[in-house]
Each structure stands twice: as C-alpha cells, then as structure tokens.
A protein has these predicted regions:
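Sequence context of c-type cytochrome heme-c attachment sites
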Residues: 1, 9, 39-42, 81-88
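The canonical Cys-X-X-Cys-His
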Residues: 1-4, 57, 94-103, 160, ...
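Axial heme c-ligation environment in periplasmic c-type cytochrome domains
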Residues: 7-14, 29-73, 109-115, 133-159, ...
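Sequence context surrounding c-type heme c attachment/ligation sites in exported
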Residues: 19, 86-98, 113, 117-126, ...
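Extended amphipathic alpha-helical interaction segments
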Residues: 70-91, 96-106
Length: 169
C-alpha cells in the first residue's frame, strides 16, 4: 500500500521498518546483488536513483506505522513459534530470534537488524526458506541468517512466520 503496509501476504510491509535496513536492501536491489521476482519491475527504476533518493525512500517508509498482524490461533503452531522466537533451540544451533530482532520484533536499527513484528506470513516464510537455500545471500547479515535457517524445518519456519506476524508492542 501507499503507506508501506502491504495487503498481499507475499509482499513485505515496509512501514515502520528500520531505515538502515531498508536503505541497504534498496541498494542491494539497485546494484543487482539481491534478486527477487517480485522486485524485477522496480529494479530498473531503482537504478535511476542516487543514494540520497534511496535514503529518502527508506526514511519515508520507516516513518509510517506498521499495521498489526493476527497470528493464527493454532496452539501447536504458536507454542513452537514462541519457543523458537524467544528461546531458540541450542541443540539444533538456533539462537533466540530476540537476540537480534528484539522481544517485540522491532529489530535493531543501529545494527541493521530488520523489524519482523506484524510482517506478512508469506513474505516471512519465503524469506526464511530463501536464507535456508542460500538463495538470499546479501551481506554479513544474510550469512548469519543462512546459518540459522539451515537448521529450521518447514514446520518451524511456518510457526516462526505465524508468531512474528502476530507480534506487536
């Protein structure tokens, strides 16, 4: 949407996203480092913009308030998602998501960790799977996420996406 709150589950919500993270991702798309079928139509436009334009776009969307998501009321899904997000699973090499994305999913803007609270389920699912398959490979943060996501099953990814979609402060 025009306020950065996507109505499609496959498209990310940009509203309220950390400015540094948005800027970096726009730069990756512009430079052709990050590829995504949904962004193919926008990439040529991004290539006409300078750094100041990208910073302005990132600031624009980061200043909007993200809409609140509603997690599916599935007890097993919520239990798995809650456990992984808050505490991780050290036996599987999965640290708590709160370590980088914070308790309420607001991320860490100084470190460049994205906000995940209220993010679209479809987008979260496809992103975690892209990290797991190493299809998404832009920067050091991607390497960190790849090493975590490779240890997640499809069911755990679904549970995490559902849990994060329902996070709010």
């Amino acid at each position: 949407g025009t306020d950065g709150n996507s109505i499609s589950s496959d498209w990310p919500k940009l509203a309220g996203q950390n400015q540094k993270y948005l800027y970096e991702q726009l730069q990756y798309f512009k430079d052709g480092v990050r590829m995504n079928a949904l962004m193919m139509s926008v990439t040529p436009y991004l290539q006409t913009l300078d750094d100041e334009d990208l910073l302005d776009i990132a600031a624009f969307y980061s200043n909007y308030e993200t809409s609140v998501g509603q997690a599916k009321n599935d007890e097993e899904l919520l239990n798995i998602g809650t456990q992984l997000y808050r505490f991780g699973n050290m036996k599987k090499g999965i640290p708590a998501c709160t370590s980088c994305h914070a308790v309420y999913g607001q991320g860490n803007s100084l470190a460049g960790f994205p906000a995940v609270a209220g993010q679209q389920i479809g987008y979260l699912t496809s992103t975690l799977k892209a990290y797991r398959s190493k299809e998404r490979n832009t920067g050091e943060l991607s390497e960190m996420m790849q090493s975590i996501a490779q240890n997640l099953s499809d069911d755990e990814i679904d549970a995490l996406a559902n849990y994060m979609h329902g996070l709010y402060q």
